[in-house]
Amino acid sequence: IEETGWFVWNMATYDLREAVNRSAKALPYGEDEFEFAGVTKASCLEAPGARVAESPINFEIEFVQSLHIPTGNPVSTFDLIIGRVAHVHIKDEFILDDGKIDILSIKPLARLGYYDYTYVDKMFEMKAPAATAEELAGLEGRTD
């Protein structure tokens, strides 16, 4: 990431859970992670490399900086990588008529810890208290 100045984030979903799990395996240098995970490569607009074609949402992210955080363990490290999203790819079938993302159809996957995962299958709206119309529009990602 630091060498190329780019990285790609692919949304993990319930439907991709097996590929996500396979992608956690450390592979020998040069072995194709996409092939090993059983997913298809899609080209990026600027980032070198590829994104996961089966993922409903992908971000091409320009590298900003890395923070190397000590873990207290001489064998392992924790690196926090910070970037700026340069390009967002969203499959059309997951964009609702109002322009929002159909999260319930995507079923985003989240790791809870241990061997446990969950996915989004319920959603509710909760507006910020005492927010102005302009602030609420900003929270929705609008600029009007």
Language-model features, listed with the residues they occupy:
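Basic, polyanion-binding surface patches
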Residues: 2-144
